[in-house]
Amino acid sequence: MAGIPRDNRPVILTYHDIGMNHKTCFDVLFYDEDMQEIMRHFAVCQVNAPGQHEGASTFPAGFTYPSMDKLSETLPIVLKHFKIKSVIGMGVGAGANILTRFALKYPDLVEGLVLMNINAQAEGWADRAASKVSQSNAIVIIILLTPCLNITIPVSLQLCRLAGPT
């Protein structure tokens, strides 16, 4: 949790995509100079999916990863722990899917959502990972998230140039 929640403002709640954690997914955004003004006015709570935090151990044999629904059901517990009354959810990929499920189940806790690269299918994390590397999805992901993730695509691979930082 970064910042101090204010009674009259929602907390920004982030949820990352698969293969990432809150640092690898959101640090580029939250440490950007232009974002500092927002950070002075809002607290941020960044959630890591099980096993995605830095230094996480591998899962034991036979471990079944929680479904998107189960992951969304953990969020009210996090909010209660930090005494958070409402959030603006910010999710990427599978994190966007999880936050959408959370908002549908707990609409009174959600002021709004910022969703990037959402896939609304009811798939598990393994299926999501497989779809990420499919040819068409990989191109779309790279092109859409390049400005957010500070990735440079070689000119020879660029199909079109999108507005944003280069």
Report residues per predicted region.
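Conserved alpha/beta-hydrolase "nucleophile elbow" surrounding the catalytic nucleophile
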Residues: 16-18, 87-96
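Alpha/beta-hydrolase
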Residues: 136-166
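Conserved HGGG/HGGXW glycine-rich cap/lid loop of the alpha/beta-hydrolase fold
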Residues: 1-60, 64
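Flexible "cap/lid" loop of the alpha/beta hydrolase fold
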Residues: 97-140
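The conserved SAM/SAH-binding core of class I Rossmann-like methyltransferase domains
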Residues: 45-47, 92, 116
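Conserved acidic catalytic loop of the alpha/beta-hydrolase fold
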Residues: 68-88
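Eukaryotic intrinsically disordered and solvent-exposed regulatory patches
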Residues: 1-2, 29-33, 63, 77, ...
